[in-house]
């Protein structure tokens, strides 16, 4: 197996308050450069053939997307991987995830819709892939109404989901991921939830209660178990971080 060498230096993946939107563009580019499409001769490719290579996300396109949304005063929230990076150090993400209504999406002709279902749409803004969560889903609508904040970039502030909203969205997605045997994504989502709990200690009871309203009884029980496990791992992480800090702290 071979892979193309990345052209840019991979940096710590985070989007702290006040960082330039150009960092968003770099995150998307770095994710593209280490993506699975760079590998050749894998068993899957040999068996099924290579899939189409995604387009290279151009940095200027990512900047222009957020400027367009701001100039049009679009009612939306930044969610998904980029929103995660405003709260924790994490992994690269190759697309922009937005939450908005279907009616709002229709007012942005520059977002070319590639696929659409009842609650989701996949679109493209020039070279940038944009995944859209639609507020026709009752839970997504509640997230938009109850869990909105703003993240300040150097150039402008962007409407973004809160820590609590991210946890709600990830909990909601987990049963479907497990039914699809998308175990890699399910594991990543559980890790995301654990990190958000460990670093921000949100109140979890109202969040699971909100998600439960949209779940079948069997899924409700499983999510309670998953959330308890994430909470326990978060507690253990904080304990170990505290122990490491006390060990390395210089004596007076």
Positions of PLM-derived features:
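Compositionally biased terminal segments of proteins
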Residues: 2-252
